[in-house]
Structures are given as structure tokens and as C-alpha cells.
Amino acid sequence: MANLWDERAERYRTSAVHAGGPDLDLVVEWCDVERGTTVLDVATGGGHVARRLRELGAQVVTVDRSPGMQPDVIAPAEHLPFADRSFDVVVNRLAAHHFDSIPEAVAEFARIADRRVVVEDHRYTDEQTEQAEKLRDPSHVRSLSEDEWRSLLTAAGLEVEHATVYEMPLEFEDWLARTDTPEADRPRIRELLAPLSSEDGSTWLSPILIIGARRP
């Protein structure tokens, strides 16, 4: 799997969807950092969260299981090589649906965070949308509902502070190209996502959950 993400690394570093947007602004706001705040950015991908937080003076360590993403530390989200409560904030953006075990990853986030955890990911919509996501990208494991996220964070000993859903517009051609989706699969994906698509079929709206929790 790491080799797959090594191949995709540059596309995610330059992806406009990942590099900006009101969702990224909100994630940064909810991290609530100041100069010297320590942050662990898990599954950093293109490093966009880390860049924004560093601009605010935070001390950010990035971790990703893919060497091609050029993280500070190479490790999966489920097994993070850091001490308990060793970072003020743990943040994870647009990656959890690829994790082998989201519950294990959330337990790690809660173990390492001294203050809060902020997560952004595609929210579960229905099985039809999940089918489209997996057809587009076999590394997609599963998206969770807001209730599932709340339950996991609470079970890990955290208190949910904020939660909101952002409807992220995704251009089909760009979205499919980013994962080298075979041309033969693209019509079926468009068909599955028709209920969420624009009238002209050029884009679709993906519900994105942003949720923040704190240590009591």
C-alpha cells in the first residue's frame, strides 16, 4: 500500500482540494494553536495541515506510512511511535477512510494527545457511495458516520467539542485522475454517484465530517 501512495504523492501535494478550502481553514481553527503548541499531523499526505499550522508558530511533527509523502516519521496511524500525551494536539485530515482499523487509530490519537484531537474525513453516506469510492480507489476501506466517530472518540476517553459537515465539491475528471481510475470503471462510478452529482455531471458533492474532541 505504501508503494501505491508513493506513486500518488505528488498529485496529493499539488491537489487544490487538499491544499485549501473552508474545510482546511476550520481544521486549523479547531486545532487552536499558538506559538510553541506541539502538533502531531497523522497521515500528513501532502503536508497541507502541517504547513498551515507551522505558519501560526506551532511545532509540527508529520507522520505517514508512505515514504513518498516525505513525513518526519514513517508509521501507520494504528501504531504511532510516540509517548502518551506527548503532543498538545493530534490532527488527521482526509485519510481515515484508508486506515486498516479506524478504532485502533483513534485510540492512538487519544493516547498521544494532551489537549485535543481534530479529525476530518469523508462521512458515510450510503452503500452505493461506498461502492463508488472503492471502485475508484481500492485503497478506500470505509467511511464512518458522525455517530460512529462520536462513539469512537468517546470510547477513547475524549469529549466531543465540535462537529460539522461540509459539502465538498469534487470535479469528476480531477478526482478520477488522481487515483488513475481505469477508464472502463468511470461510467459506473458516475452512475453510482448520480444522486450527489451536479446537473451537468461535472462534479459531485462529498459530505465531509470535521470533528474535534478534547481531553477532559
Model-identified regions with their sequence ranges:
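Conserved class I S-adenosyl-L-methionine
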Residues: M1-E34, H48-R52, E167, E173-A177
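Class I SAM-dependent methyltransferase SAM/SAH-binding core
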Residues: L40-H79
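Conserved Class I S-adenosyl-L-methionine
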Residues: G46-H48, E161-P216
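A conserved beta-strand element that flanks and buttresses the S-adenosyl-L-methionine
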Residues: V91
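Short catalytic micro-motifs in class I SAM-dependent methyltransferases
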Residues: L94-A95
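A short glycine-rich, Lys/Arg-flanked "PGG" loop and its adjoining helix->strand segment in the class I
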Residues: P103-V117
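Short, glycine-/aromatic-enriched active-site segment of Class I SAM-dependent methyltransferases
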Residues: H122-H140
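Short alpha-helix
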Residues: R142-G157
